[in-house]
A protein has these predicted regions:
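An amphipathic alpha-helix signature
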Residues: 20-27, 48, 52, 56
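Short loop/turn motifs at secondary-structure junctions and domain boundaries
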Residues: 56-62
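Acyl-donor (CoA/ACP) binding surface of acyl/acetyltransferases
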Residues: 1-38, 65-172
Length: 172
């Protein structure tokens, strides 16, 4: 039995801490190049040790997030980490169902309520319009273009940047 702590629930999904019991399911997701090509840090070919490093609870001072599940089925991962960067990946079978928007909206609400970050950011490779669309639906504003490293593709790629301020925050 998985004793991971639940972080949040939505109508259809749950976000809970990742544990070593999640390695096989997370590695199956990371074994689809079409998924990891849209991430900055996940390697290709898939590396089980890297997956295992991501399948452990995130220390509270480092971020918030973990495994996205629908019932007992793991559908992906989502987190806010570092300097308030939102990251997520879903198994391809679960693209186009609104899961990314649903879990990220709840994670954003929890993150701002938590008070550790007053601004979130996200970076999306320009050839990943689906994630850019999710961020815009979530209220993110698009910033300047830049480049970002893509471990799975082994190169720097053109990147779109997005930011979202906490409700009520006024910036000078």
């Amino acid at each position: 039995m998985n004793s991971a702590r639940n972080i949040l629930r939505t109508e259809r999904l749950m976000l809970r801490e990742a544990t070593s019991a999640d390695i096989d399911a997370a590695h199956a997701i990371a074994s689809d190049f079409e998924v990891v090509r849209n991430t900055g840090t996940w390697p290709w070919p898939p590396d089980r040790d890297f997956t295992a490093s991501r399948c452990q609870p995130i220390p509270a001072d480092k971020g918030l997030g973990g495994i996205v599940a629908r019932g007992s089925q793991i559908v992906g991962m989502a987190s806010v980490f570092g300097e308030g960067e939102l990251g997520y990946m879903l198994a391809r079978a679960h693209w186009g169902k609104g899961y990314a928007t649903e879990i990220c909206r709840a994670l954003i609400d929890l993150t701002f309520a938590d008070g550790r970050w007053d601004r979130l950011k996200a970076c999306v490779f320009t050839d990943n319009p689906g994630s850019a669309h999710v961020l815009l639906k979530l209220g993110f504003s698009e910033g300047s273009a830049c480049t970002g490293n893509c471990a799975s593709r082994g190169q720097e790629l053109p990147t779109r940047t997005f930011t979202l301020d906490a409700p009520g925050l006024e910036r000078a």
